[in-house]
Amino acid sequence: MAANAAGPASRYDVTLDQSDAELVEEIAWKLATQATGRPDDAEWVEAARNAWHAWPATLRRDLAGFRRDSGPDGAIVLRGLPVDSMGLPPTPRVNGSVQREASLGAAVLLMTACGLGDPGAFLPEKNGALVQDVVPVPGMEEFQGNAGSTLLTFHNENAFHEHRPDFVMLLCLRADPTGRAGLRTACVRRVLPLLSDSTVDALWAPEFRTAPPPSFQLSGPEEAPAPVLLGDRSDPDLRVDLAATEPVTERAAEALRELQAHFDATAVTHRLLPGELAIVDNRVTVHGRTEFTPRYDGTDRWLQRTFVLTDLRRSRAMRPADGYVLGAAPQPA
C-alpha cells in the first residue's frame, strides 16, 4: 500500500504512469480552456463527457471495473492526476465556497464523473454547484461537515435522501501542511462478517430515523423509521449517518454502537496528496475525516468534491429542465 494510507490494504490503488498522466493533463487543459460556458452548464458537462472517451484505455477500464464492483473496501484512489498545484490561489476560507469557473480540477472531476455516470448536486447544498470546495472555515471547527476540522463521524453522503449520490469523489488540490488531515472510509463488506447476529437483525429492521440538515428545509410529515441495511442480505447497501441517524428502539441503539466500533476498527485512512482522487462508493461505504488543526493562512488542506449518480433518470422529478441539480422537493406536474 502507498505510504500515505493507513489501515487494511485496498486492491484499488491506481498510479498513472508518465504517459497516461501527460495525456490526461493535455485533455483536461483543453477542456478547461476551450469548452463553452462554465462547469455547471450542460454544454460544459457534455464537453467533459466527450473528453472522457479520450482518456487512456487502461484508466477507463479500471474505473469501469470499479463502477461494476467497488471491492471489499468500496473505494479507489487514483494518483498522478493534474491539478496545477503551482498555479493555485490561497485555500478559500469562506463557508460554501465552490468552483464555478473552468479549472484543471473541475475538468478532471467532471470527466471522471461522466465516466462513472453523471455528475449531480443538490440545490440546498452549496447552491447546487457541481464542483464544491472542501476546506476548513474559521469559526466552524466543531461543525460536523466539510467546513469543520474536528473528527468527522462516519456517514453515507446525504443518507437521508432518496437520491443520495452513488459515488463521492474528492480530489486533493493542496494537502494538509501538518499531515494530520485524512479521509477515513469503512465498508459494510468488511464490517458485516464481524457483527453479532442480533446487531445484523436490528440493522435490517425499520428502527432508525436519519434527519436531513437544516439547509434542505424539507416539509411534510416526519420520515417513517427505516433500516440501516438494504438490498441483498449477503451484500447489502448501507444508509447511515452516525451524527444524524437516531435509533427508535434500545436494540437499534446498541446496534449503532456496535456498528460504529467496527467502522473504527476496519477504517482505512487516506492522507491525500495533490493530484490524488479518492472515489467512495456511497452505497456500501461510509466516510469521515480525522481531526486536524487549520492554520487559516492560505496553505490549508483543499479538496474539491463532485457527486456521481449512476441512474440520473430516477431523480428526474427533482431536476428542473432535466439538469444535473436536484431541488429540495419534486417538481409540480
UniProtKB/Swiss-Prot annotation:
SUPFAM superfamilies: Clavaminate synthase-like. Binds 1 Fe(2+) ion per subunit. InterPro entries: AlphaKG_dependent_hydroxylases, Clavaminate_syn-like, TauD-like_sf, TauD/TfdA-like. L-asparagine binds at E125, N146, E157, N158, R305. The keyword Oxidoreductase applies. One of its GO terms (molecular function) is iron ion binding. Its cofactor is Fe(2+). GO terms for biological process: antibiotic biosynthetic process. It catalyses: L-asparagine + 2-oxoglutarate + O2 = (2S,3S)-3-hydroxyasparagine + succinate + CO2. Pathway: Antibiotic biosynthesis; calcium-dependent antibiotic biosynthesis. Belongs to the clavaminate synthase family. This is L-asparagine oxygenase. It comes from Streptomyces coelicolor (strain ATCC BAA-471 / A3(2) / M145). The gene is asnO.
